[in-house]
Structure formats: C-alpha cells, structure tokens
A protein has these predicted regions:
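Short, surface-exposed coil-to-beta transition loops
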Residues: 67, 91-93, 149-156, 171, ...
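Bacterial N-terminal signal peptides
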Residues: 28-38
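Extended beta-strand-rich segments in extracellular/periplasmic secretory proteins, especially
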Residues: 126-182
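Extended soluble regions of mature proteins
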Residues: 167-254, 261
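An acidic-aromatic
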Residues: 74-133
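Short, surface-exposed beta-strand/loop "edge" segments at domain boundaries and coil↔beta transitions
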Residues: 63-64, 85-96, 102, 114, ...
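Bacterial N-terminal signal peptides that target proteins for export
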Residues: 5-30
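N-terminal cleavable signal peptides for secretion/export
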Residues: 42-82, 125-131, 135-142, 258-267
C-alpha cells in the first residue's frame, strides 16, 4: 500500500492526492520499463533486444503468448531476460540469474516492478534441483507500489523427458503459495512445468491456481515451438496458439496481475 504524508487537506482531497501520486508513479515506472524495450513497428513483426544484448530463442506458447529470451553482456554471468508478448504487445519482462532466482520482473501494462529482497531464508536453486531432483524455496519480493510478497514453494523433477519441436525438456511438479506481509494467503498454485538443462531456464506448463477470493483458474502455458537464429519465426512477436480461445488474461486489478505475473518469473 502507498503511504502518503499527512497534510491539512480534507480526507477526500488526501485520497485524490494519493491516487494521483500513485498513478503517476505507476505510469512513470511503466514508461521506464517500456523504454528499455526497442521500438516495434505497428505490425509488431520482430523483436530486437536492447543494445548489448543477444536474442537466443523465440518460443511460441499455449495461452496466446510468445516469449523472447535474451542475454546481455553487461549482466552478471548466467543472467537472462525474457519478454512476453500477447496480441496487444509486450506484457511482461523479467530477469533471472544462473540459479533461476526471480531477480526482477515488470508487469508492463501497469508498470509494477517486483525485485528480489536479499537475505532469503531459502533461495531458489536450479543447480540443487538438477543435482538432487528437488528444490525448496522461501523468499520475499518488494514491489514498486510498496507491496511485499512472501513466496514459499517447491520444485521436483518427475523423471520424465519430452521432445518439443526438437528441444529436449524435463518435466517438473511444483507448488507455490504467495502470502502478503501479514501472512494471509493471496494465491496458491500447483502444476507441471518444464526445464531445459542446456538453456538453464524453466518453461510454463499446466497449472491450477486459486486466490484469496476463492476463484480457481486452470491454465496451459506449455511451449509449442522454438525458433533459433536463422529459423522461421525467430523474433516474431505475434502469438500463434490458443488466441481464438481468448485465454489471455487482462483487466485484472493490479495485485492480481502482479501475482499472476510470477507464473512467468523464471521462464
């Protein structure tokens, strides 16, 4: 929650002032995030990563999204970025490190930015998952709107391997619970994802989520096709799968958008 300094204005004026200030910060954050992305033509034909960065692969996913995965020379070794596009344009951007920790993520339409707080009780560890077959995590993130979120969960390798469009992936099971700062459950998620050892990242899968309102949602964000440099579809920003089903979420309150954005945080 955004806290405003007390003034001599009426309570109504205080609320209006707080609302305008919060909107200003969100818009400013959104513009700053969007300015880090290269300008796209009206047709949104291709994605070009920022200067000093190299696009590695474009992935078409279920659920009407296409993701652009890239690395930047100025980042720490092992860091990588992803930008997700819907038919309406870029929606979500995130950076993970070599252990797939959620370093920072931005919900581009709202401008909300979440960053990993230091000193986690149990950081996510991709190397632990690969070595032992399971990894527990327990960490906090801070949002640009003042919200602090507590994430607790577990990833497990199922032992199954699949080939999707020529890329070898391994299946995982996961469960994740996100709490607010007071310890109230905001959202619970469980399901199946994929990992790529070679690429050092997660990909979405089939999952079930339930939030504090009691709403339940079942989604499928599995990868369908991979386009590498020189291949058709590399850099395309037009989603190709499930768009006729209108599965893309939109118009949700900021908190729900923020919570659901963690679906893509490590992918």
């Amino acid at each position: 929650m955004v806290r405003m300094a007390k003034t001599t204005c009426s309570p109504r004026a205080d609320r209006q002032q707080a609302l305008h200030a919060a909107r200003g910060r969100i818009l400013a954050a959104g513009m700053a995030a969007l300015l880090t992305l290269p300008a796209l033509p009206a047709s949104a034909a291709n994605f070009t990563p920022p200067d000093g960065c190299r696009l590695e692969v474009t992935v078409q996913n279920r659920g009407c999204t296409v993701s652009q995965h890239y690395r930047c020379s100025g980042d720490a070794p092992g860091d990588q970025w992803v930008v997700y596009f819907t038919p309406d344009g870029p929606r979500y951007q995130s950076r993970i490190d070599r252990e797939t920790r959620w370093m920072e993520s931005t919900d581009l339409p709202s401008g909300l930015v979440d960053t990993l707080e230091p000193g986690a009780k149990d950081d996510a560890s991709f190397s632990t998952l690969l070595k032992t077959g399971a990894d527990d995590f327990d960490f906090w993130t801070s949002s640009s709107n003042g919200e602090r979120l507590h994430h607790v969960g577990r990833d497990e390798l199922t032992g199954e391997k699949v080939d999707i469009d020529g890329v070898e992936l391994e299946l995982t099971r996961f469960q994740l619970t996100t709490y607010n700062e007071s310890g109230d459950v905001l959202i619970e998620r469980e399901g199946q994802q994929f990992i790529s050892r070679a690429q050092g990242r997660f990909y979405g899968g089939v999952e079930r989520s339930s939030d504090w309102t009691g709403a339940v949602e079942n989604t499928n964000d599995s990868p369908v096709s991979f386009s590498f440099p020189g291949q058709p579809g590399f850099g395309s920003t037009k989603p190709e799968y499930d768009c006729d089903l209108q599965m893309v979420r939109g118009g949700k309150p900021d908190l729900m958008r923020q919570l659901m954005s963690f679906k893509e945080a490590r992918t």
